[in-house]
Amino acid sequence: MEPAAFEAQLKRDGFAEIETKSAPPGVFSPVHSHACDLRALVMTGELTLHCQGASQTYRAGDMVVLAAGSEHAELNGPEGYTYIVGRRQPKL
């Protein structure tokens, strides 16, 4: 998906906080969760998410979707990664 189309989709789906970020290579983030829904599009590099006993690697062009409160750990790839991320507060 093209970045502009991804950002437009985020806005349509109520993701108000949208930014492009970079993550450094090889960093491991232990198990944690976020108070908001996250949706990200990996632009370059790769990351591996460990969630509910399973691991999945995401590369350029892949979309990551995490619901608020989902516990996960992250391992940045050997070259790090860049991504567009949207955050949405969960509906009460």
Where are these regions (language model features)?
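Short, conserved beta-strand element in jelly-roll/cupin
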Residues: S33-L49
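Extreme N-terminal tail/first-helix region
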Residues: M1-K11
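Ligand-binding loop in jelly-roll beta-barrel domains
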Residues: A68-L92
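Short acidic-glycine-tyrosine-enriched beta hairpin
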Residues: Q52-G69
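Short, charged/polar surface micro-motifs in flexible loops or helix N-caps
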Residues: P25-G26, T44-L47, Q89-L92
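Short histidine-centered beta-strand/loop micro-motifs
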Residues: E7, F28-H34, C51, L75-N76
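Conserved short histidine dyad/triad with adjacent acidic residue
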Residues: E17-H34, A68-G69
